[in-house]
């Protein structure tokens, strides 16, 4: 759950950054209405119970209502949505909820019934949500990756400045505790 929380904290900070760009023609105070954070989890039996608790705390998951079958037909996925004003805080690996007075965040959570691996989750994202949301750009972030405070904005900007751009990627840096250095070059890469 702390890896998921680390990613979500970074995403929340990026949304706040875009909302604070008050002189922007695209972004600004209401920017959060243009952003939907889609979370896809691969398999109901596989999801970490503490991660489920974090999602419930954010308001985008309800425990106990998902069923394997409805009217005799197998369920493929469970979809939850919520606009949250709850934030997350990390102290070491301890995740806690905290009220956020500023920027709401629109969340869409897809809990796949079966574990069908990462590529299938990407397919779900593009084929199911992409068709409905019709986004200008999509940013895929693995749980545990912490985006910098403006990195999602910088990716958006790359697409905005070059409409023929079909893909972009950001830089990933190793997260180290303060005062720690990597002396082994194999680990550093």
From Swiss-Prot:
Q: Which GO terms describe its cellular component?
A: cell septum; plasma membrane
Q: Taking the first listed entry, what is the main subcellular location of this protein, grouped into a coarse class?
A: membrane
- Keyword Repeat applies: no
Q: Which Pfam families match?
A: Chitin_synth_1
A GO molecular function assigned to this protein is:
chitin synthase activity
Going by the UniProt record, its keywords in alphabetical order are: Cell membrane, Cell wall biogenesis/degradation, Glycosyltransferase, Membrane, Transferase, Transmembrane
Catalytic activity annotated for this protein?
[(1->4)-N-acetyl-beta-D-glucosaminyl](n) + UDP-N-acetyl-alpha-D-glucosamine = [(1->4)-N-acetyl-beta-D-glucosaminyl](n+1) + UDP + H(+)
> InterPro entries recorded for this chain?
Chitin_synth, Chitin_synth_fun
Subcellular localization(s) per the UniProt record: Cell membrane
Membrane topology is: Multi-pass membrane protein
Q: What is its EC number?
A: 2.4.1.16
User: Can you supply a Gene Ontology BP term from the record?
Assistant: cell wall organization
Please explain the role this protein plays, according to its UniProt record: Polymerizes chitin, a structural polymer of the cell wall and septum, by transferring the sugar moiety of UDP-GlcNAc to the non-reducing end of the growing chitin polymer.
Q: Which family does it belong to?
A: Belongs to the chitin synthase family.
Q: What is this protein called?
A: Chitin synthase 1
Tell me the gene name.
CHS1
